[in-house]
Amino acid sequence: MLGDAHFLVTCPIDLFSEVRVTLHHGGPGVEAPADCPKSAAALTATLAHLGRADLGARLSVRSAIPRSKGMGSSSADVAATIAAAGLALGTKLLPDLVARIAASVEPTDGIMFPGIALMDHREGRILEALGPPPPMEIIALDFGGTVDTVEFNSVDRRSVWRSIGTEVDRALELVKDGLRRGDPGTIGEGATISARASQRVSPKPRMPAVLEFAGAAGAVGVNVGHSGTIIGVLLDAGARQGEAVLQQARQAFPDAKAIHRFRLTGGGLQQLR
């Protein structure tokens, strides 16, 4: 926590959610995929905010982001839905408004902000824009399990967060410094401190093994989602070791449910033609 504010640092990767919103005058109501109730709620909230609750809407969502892993899948869907609804009404909504509407539906990742963002995910406000990331890759290890982010964030963990405040402050300082200097090593150092500290909030049994693997593989660090089940091994993309470490991870963790290779990107919303 920063004072009394909850926060996270975004970690955008090269997986995306694509949303299409079609408006009609056939009466209010939203038609949406059954597995996207948060996006449907976000669409309803956006139309109400823009004074067009009288309109009906159809929503389609296509996403490659793994679900219920704390990887921001619903945040990406929701943010894209809000932006698409605005565009359907001829309005390009600013990221700050997208974030506020998103947070009215559920605690939200800051994926709508460009670059890397320090985000109050409960209030839907950016605390600081941290700039673009240097070239980095992530080998993401999924050992199974799912997380309900709404349920996770409904639990009062302030005492636990405060107990690790010193480590979290140091981790944030290092990540911010690494981003300023474009230094993957410093970013990785900060992320690792945060990941170790988060074991007291959301323990991951395989964390010790992944830390050992990351050190042996020459990674710059490890990271975890704020409320997720995935452990990421952070790599300096300039070292060109992504494919080799991916294969090493598959050999080292044959029990993993899935192992992915991602590229760290900047956040933000894009309009597709």
Model-flagged regions — what are they?
Residues 71-77, 164, 222-226:
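Short glycine/threonine-rich catalytic loop with a Thr-x-Gly-x-Asp
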Residues 18-22, 219-225:
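Short, flexible, solvent-exposed loop/turn segments with mixed acidic/basic and small polar residues
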Residues 221-237:
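Acyl-group transfer acyltransferase/transacylase scaffold of fatty acid/polyketide systems
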Residues 94-220, 236-273:
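ATP-dependent small-molecule kinase catalytic core of the GHMP/sugar-kinase superfamily
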Residues 69-95, 111:
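DPxDG-like acidic metal-binding loop motif
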Residues 12-13, 216, 223-227:
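A structural signal for short secondary-structure junctions
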Residues 1-69, 267, 273:
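ATP-binding N-lobe of GHMP and related small-molecule kinases
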